[in-house]
Design a protein with these regions (language model features):
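Catalytic Walker B motif of ABC-type/P-loop ATPase nucleotide-binding domains
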Residues: 20-24
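Short loop immediately C-terminal to the Walker-B catalytic DE motif
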Residues: 26-27, 59
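ABC ATPase "signature
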Residues: 80-81
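Single conserved hydrophobic/aromatic residue that forms the stacking wall/gate
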Residues: 1-6, 10
């Protein structure tokens, strides 16, 4: 298949490396080609001897391919965690200020206050959902987590 040929071509040119270091490898690619490249990278890491270190601003790609996420912002490492744990752990809570203050300390990481209430990044999303069944607590996407941690959405 053409996919197999492309994969063999990449391996031949790279001399069958154990580690690929990629900087913005999918930037500027159309969605079809980007998807094909991600599939090739996923095929590559099926061999447990192979690893990829990939920097990207396209967080959807990281959600699809990464096992671990390290987030650097202004030269500072803000977090490094297993991707699946990160996405299961955090939620985005939408509620009023009064509801927010009723949560135990440590669950609210960052809050953005607006005219219609608060939007907060919370730890232990499932616990928050049990404590506040009337509130909306969505699963956080990697974009959400990074925006809150960088302070862009926090107040």
């Amino acid at each position: 298949t053409s996919r197999r040929q492309r994969q063999m071509c990449i391996r031949d040119r790279a001399h069958d490396p154990e580690l690929l270091i990629l900087d913005e490898a999918t930037a500027g690619l159309d969605p079809v080609v980007r998807g094909e490249l991600l599939d090739l990278l996923l095929d590559f890491i099926q061999d447990e001897r192979h690893s990829i270190v990939m920097s990207s601003h396209i967080t959807a790609d990281l959600e699809q391919i990464a096992d671990s996420i390290a987030y650097l912002h202004n030269g500072q490492l803000l977090f490094q965690e297993n991707k699946d744990d990160l996405l299961q752990e955090y939620g985005v809570l939408h509620c009023g200020e009064d509801v927010l203050t009723s949560l135990p300390a440590g669950l609210v990481v960052f809050t953005r206050r607006g005219a219609y209430g608060c939007e907060s990044l919370v730890r232990e999303r499932r616990t928050v959902q049990e404590l506040l069944p009337e509130a909306v607590c969505d699963a956080a996407r990697l974009d959400d987590i990074m925006r809150f941690f960088s302070g862009r959405d926090a107040q």
